[in-house]
Amino acid sequence: MADPAECNIKVVCRVRPMNATEQNTSHICTKFISEEQVQIGGKLNMFDRIFKPNTTQEEVYNKAARQIVKDVLDGYNGTIFAYGQTSSGKTFTMEGVMGNPQYMGIIPRIVQDIFNHIYQMDESLEFHIKVSYFEIYMDRIRDLLDVSKTNLSVHEDKNRVPFVKGATERFASSPEEVMDVIEEGKSNRHIAVTNMNEHSSRSHSIFLIQVKQENMETKKKLSGKLYLVDLAGSEKVSKTGAEGTVLDEAKNINKSLSALGNVISALADGKKSHIPYRDSKMTRILQESLGGNARTTIVICCSPSSFNESESKSTLMFGQRAKTIKNTVTVNMELTAEEWRNRYEKEKEKNGRLKAQLLILENELQRWRAGESVPVKEQGNKNDEILKEMMKPKQMTVHVSEEEKNKWEEEKVKLYEQLDEKDSEIDNQSRLTEKLKQQMLEQEELLSSMQRDYELLQSQMGRLEAENAAAKEEAKEVLQALEEMAVNYDEKSKEVEDKNRMNETLSEEVNEKMTALHTTSTELQKLQELEQHQRRRITEMMASLLKDLGEIGTALGGNAADMKPNVENIEKVDEEFTMARLFVSKMKTEVKTMSQRCKILEASNAENETKIRTSEDELDSCRMTIQQHEAKMKSLSENIRETEGKKRHLEDSLDMLNEEIVKLRAAEEIRLTDQEDKKREEEDKMQSATEMQASMSEQMESHRDAHQKQLANLRTEINEKEHQMEELKDVNQRMTLQHEKLQLDYEKLKIEEAEKAAKLRELSQQFDRREQAKQDLKGLEETVAKELQTLHNLRKLFVSDLQNRVKKALEGGDRDDDSGGSQAQKQKISFLENNLEQLTKVHKQLVRDNADLRCELPKLERRLRATSERVKALEMSLKETKEGAMRDRKRYQQEVDRIREAVRQRNFAKRGSSAQIAKAIRAGHPPPSPGGSTGIRGGGYSGIRGGGSPVIRPPSHGSPEPISHNNSFEKSLNPNDAENMEKKANKRLPKLPPGGNKLTESDIAAMKARSKARNNTPGKAPLTTSGEQGS
């Protein structure tokens, strides 16, 4: 480690241009004094650099971030992060527009600059670059390169430096690979739309670049980390209009930014002993960047609008506080064995000097305690010559000969060599233990995930069975209810038919009675005219009779006042007739009102019919969508079957290719053994060949049996999964059929209910008509009773008058006329009495019918309520079955996706056990072409990590490109079985070059050279497997 040095955090301020809405609604509140000073609201703020709105992306990068690239490549840690309110330009500053040279942000430019610096450095340097990309969303660390890792934790290494455990790390050897990683992470990042920003970042993103370099000549190793942080902006809910999930995100963003502000304030204060790094995961990760071992640059982004003046002021205050923080930076350097040796020698010499000085001081102290005064010259703290003299005798007392000295030097060199070997062994063992720990953790995580998947499957199966049983019970209940409704419907239809017949008969009778009433009314009018004529005659006759009686009374001396009551009775009859006329006019008005009510009811009935038609159209559209979804499901199932057939075909072809590879290996082994036997022993040639053939046949049989078992197990598993998928499809089809049946029953019930409602409306209208007719008949009864009473009184008066007149009259002509008038009046009165009797009978019949209908009306209303409730229940059950069918479809799709993901993860796990290639980059070379090999040194091999087998290449002249045959084979086998088979094969079989099925002359020459080298050095085993190479 180099000596530590202090440096302040560099703070630059960037002010973005105003957008269209701000230009229309506000004004500019910022004033640029110089390149280091800006004024907002009358307050002056100073920073390392001020970027105006017209500053380009390149200028921002050159002034703010370019120097950090050189620092990171020199072994320092670096951090660049953007801070500011929402929609202030942070993401544009950090990322910009990818692929656009003019609008690229700091991250893509810094990536390109790192590689440009590497290509211009000394050729003896070798670089390894790793990148990782994660975000802090809702106070959880989420890996943007592996979305399944949603809650990563922060740990500390042996030097107490925080790091994110479990984050995906990708090796990169070119800027294009790093940009691909950035694009992949950006596609997984959380964004949302607010009132202030259409692409508002809802999380803090951290892009980490780790650079390790090694000088191949001096073995000097340096490492540096570069954190590129895009913070989410602070938000005011009143301005952004956040609701729901966006509001929760804003709360977490403001909370983490508040924790960052608290850390900055505590560091700027300088008096606080506790720095609250652990209040937020973001501050925990950036602990080294804030007051630790890193060169940090903060880009504070502001808005020039007066609408955001308060937020801009708080952002500038944050920058002012951060500018006062000091970091202690050191070079991250791994010392070599020679450097550690030199340090050890220096410390040893220093220790010896301190021990000698300690002895001098102890002697001086003993003399002082004994009461002796020590002269100034002999005091230890002022006489360095005494220290030298005490150290010299130790060196002079030892007499060493040259031979012994040479021996000791040789032993010393050997010990140092052994120390170096032990150090390398310790490093290898530590790496191996770390790899094994990582593999154990991965296996445990895989096992726990498989257990969770199994438990989820068990719970889902139990829930599906329970839902299936509940659906069956519901279907039974629905069928029973439908049967009951059908029976009730038959009964009601019969009752309705009977009522319709009765209503028709009643309506016919009412029509007849109405016609009779019309005839009676016309006859009454005629009678009234006749009665008026008779009244006139009667009044004239009465007047003449009264005159005669008066004359007779005067002659006899009597009084004629007794005849006046007859005249009063005649006047009462006139009043009754006027009352009847008024009642007839009242009935006309009521008939008009009834006709208006009928029209209103007909209009409402037409509206209800239109509503029913619209609902039927909606049902037809829902059926069409259901049929379309079923067709899609059929097409998807057919695609799955086709892919499975293709998969089986590829597996068969893979088996054939593996058998051919084994045969070729066997043939090559036989050829090699033949050549060796010709050189050594020509006599035992046939015997060794037969033994080799027997061993190879046994190996081929064992390989074939193991492979067949593996394939059989995999095929059985695939068949079981297919069987489960078919069962789920059958269940889905049954549910769809039940859904269709319920839909049809629901439509039938709806039609029946519409018909019943129409009939009920007709019955209610008829009932209203009957009520009105009853009221009308009541009035008629009263008027007819009054008329009958008046007619009865008139009849008595006429009879009495006629008797008196017959007794008193003397002339025959008058008697004949009066008798004729009385007979005509009697006939009319008898006709009216007959009509009244018929009307009373009709009235009584109507009253009886009304009473019967009133008794039946509550029953019909109860039945109607029951049917309406049942229809509602059926609608709810239909809705629930629809939702259940949708849930089943979603569950089925999720199950299919889960099975696919499990297969993909299994294949990925098998591939993950293979080698992870750490791509080394040699400095001083131009960037490699996309199609060539990247970062290859020392004979054309890439640096290999993990447990994968290396690729053995023939000499470069005339050799074809290597083709990997083992990827697909490893997919069909378990990793352990594949490794065992490979080890067994490597014990006896040589490695074939991956150049194809045919051996070239260069391949044969290379194999002969390897066999000779193997024979010459029997003590050393060849590096054939990855495990041997790793050890």
Swiss-Prot record:
Annotated GO MF terms: ATP binding; ATP hydrolysis activity; microtubule binding; plus-end-directed microtubule motor activity
Coiled coil: 393-857
Primary location class: cytoplasm
Annotated residues for binding of ATP: G84, Q85, T86, S87, S88, G89, K90, T91
Pfam families registered for this protein in UniProt: Kinesin
Record-stated family: Belongs to the TRAFAC class myosin-kinesin ATPase superfamily. Kinesin family. Kinesin subfamily.
Summary of subunit composition and partner proteins: Oligomer composed of two heavy chains and two light chains.
Entry remark concerning the domains of this protein: Composed of three structural domains: a large globular N-terminal domain which is responsible for the motor activity of kinesin (it hydrolyzes ATP and binds microtubule), a central alpha-helical coiled coil domain that mediates the heavy chain dimerization; and a small globular C-terminal domain which interacts with other proteins (such as the kinesin light chains), vesicles and membranous organelles.
Protein name per its UniProtKB record: Kinesin heavy chain
Annotated source species: Strongylocentrotus purpuratus (Purple sea urchin)
Taxon lineage: Eukaryota, Metazoa, Echinodermata, Eleutherozoa, Echinozoa
